[in-house]
Amino acid sequence: MADQLTEEQIAEFKEAFSLFDKDGDGTITTKELGTVMRSLGQNPTEAELQDMINEVDADGNGTIDFPEFLTMMARKMKDTDSEEEIREAFRVFDKDGNGFISAAELRHVMTNLGEKLTDEEVDEMIREADIDGDGQVNYEEFVTMMTSK
């Protein structure tokens, strides 16, 4: 996981890590983790922080060493990429850029992808993703659809 980071990213993470490793013993406390991540432009929620800490802090001693920190940051960066990919996919479908995917836009893109769908099939796809029932798919609904397993 950490091997997907550039040397520049690793150096940047090391610098941030060191700023919060007050006594220089090579570990930071879980409380300091949120501050470190925010200094690197990430904005994790408390629940996300707790999840990350639980995943990384194998011995449960409340501190995180640098290799653990690198693994965690690499995971977080990977997640950010997929969010950007979803946003890009939404833009492809949202032809007129109004923030919604209509049945006509969905049909157009699916046809370009070689999928010949009936009006009923297109309407069904919209209905499945259309959480608020307004007949079109907004970005939040699209994300939900794309990220649900």
Swiss-Prot record:
Name this polypeptide is given: Calmodulin
Bilayer-crossing regions: none
Family of this protein: Belongs to the calmodulin family.
GN (gene name): Cam
SUPFAM superfamilies documented for this protein: EF-hand (SSF47473)
N-acetylalanine modification, residue list: 2
Organism: Drosophila melanogaster (Fruit fly)
Sites where the protein binds Ca(2+) 1: 21, 23, 25, 27, 32
Domain EF-hand: 8-43, 44-79, 81-116, 117-149
Modified residues (N6,N6,N6-trimethyllysine): 95
